Amino acid sequence: MSCQERLSQWETEVSTAFAHLSHPQIWGLVLWSAGIALSGSAGITQISALLAFVLCQGEQTVFQRLREWYLDADQKSGKKRRDLEVSTCFAPLLRWVVRLWQSDKRQLPLVLDATSLGNRWTILALSVVIRSCAIPVAGKVLPAQQPGSWRP
């Protein structure tokens, strides 16, 4: 099976899970997720180099496509550009994980994490744990000094 065929299969899987996203948003998610899985890195430079080789496309073209996927609509080139509302992906991602969950027990391990980024931000993340890997399914970024149950 060719790499294009595998990416097409993956695109079908991703578009089924995230049916509310536009085709360009789906394709960006396909490229990012496949690139991370294949390269073992979340760095845009490594991913764009690998995908450019695999897809026989220019590295700068792939880099720009990956970069514009996460930019705000007003920062993207071209017309009809949209923002990606990440929060709308949390419920579909959790549904997808639960659908693929293979366990004889009807338990799903969850982890709540509060990570501080210096004195500026606290990132709250709710994740599902699968095979020693935490998959974030919900999150919020807050000012670091804001009181809350994670920081009394």
Annotate each language-model stretch with its function.
Residues 1-152:
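Conserved, well-structured functional cores that handle cations and Mg-NTP chemistry
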